[in-house]
């Protein structure tokens, strides 16, 4: 697949049946399933041995810093070099005191870090920010040539949220969230930000016959229903005219 589809080349009408059909077909081809790991395990594979910028390292609270599942801890250990960013200054200072390479920077700003990275990882950040396009622009301009940006965000179509809605009647999620980012929205946000959606990934471990059974069932129903998170993969503006590298 050579980069994202630009629906505006098909029609100037965002409700065009032809444009929607083309986007639907493209997204079906862009979906990647990873059934041997969860999203954090997938992230560790992506960053291993790489120069990495990790955006949103605090994960809301210092109480996560000593947990084995703390994302930045695992990403920074797997990467060859890792710079972490967050806007919560006191917690950034605490992490610096613990020996982490972190800075207090707004990743929706025009700030220039003076470094370029093979991987930029923004884990569960995009649904919090006022300006998702600005976040993608910031991340995109800090990519090295051939680098990739990975953005994780909750999947509103997953059974996790459907079951919660059915159980509670009124859907209440993280109170700091301001958006859900579906695949079509990721495609459009990338177009507006000057980065290009390459693929979207669904990661969750399934073993043995359970994996085979689900692969069979997904022939008849949407796989997205089973996965609580999306991982969007973008490439930077400098690489948009270049041939796509295969997704890892």
Residue map of PLM features:
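Conserved SAM-binding loop
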Residues: 44-163, 180-190, 230-238
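Aromatic-lined ligand-binding clefts that engage carbohydrates, nucleic acids, or primary amines
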Residues: 40
């Amino acid at each position: 697949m050579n980069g994202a589809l630009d629906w505006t080349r098909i029609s100037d009408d965002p409700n065009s049946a032809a444009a929607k059909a083309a986007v639907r077909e493209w997204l079906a081809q862009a979906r990647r399933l990873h059934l041997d790991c969860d999203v954090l395990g997938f992230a560790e594979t992506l960053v291993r041995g790489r120069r990495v910028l990790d955006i949103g390292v605090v994960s809301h609270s210092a109480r996560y810093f000593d947990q084995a599942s703390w994302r930045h801890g695992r990403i920074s250990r797997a990467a060859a070099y890792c710079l972490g960013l967050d806007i919560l200054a006191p917690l950034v200072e605490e992490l610096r005191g613990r020996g982490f390479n972190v800075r207090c920077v707004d990743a929706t700003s025009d700030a220039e870090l003076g470094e370029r990275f093979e991987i930029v990882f923004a884990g569960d950040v995009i649904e919090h920010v006022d300006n998702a396009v600005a976040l993608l622009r910031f991340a995109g301009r800090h990519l090295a040539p051939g680098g990739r940006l990975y953005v994780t965000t909750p999947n509103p179509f997953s059974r996790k949220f459907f079951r919660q809605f059915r159980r509670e009647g009124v859907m209440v999620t993280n109170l700091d969230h301001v958006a859900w980012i579906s695949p079509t929205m990721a495609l459009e946000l990338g177009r507006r930000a000057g980065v290009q959606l390459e693929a979207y990934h669904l990661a969750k471990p399934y073993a043995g016959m359970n994996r085979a059974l689900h692969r069979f069932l997904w022939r008849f129903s949407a796989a997205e229903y089973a996965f609580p998170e999306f991982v969007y993969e973008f490439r930077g503006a400098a690489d948009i005219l270049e041939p796509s590298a295969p997704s890892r």
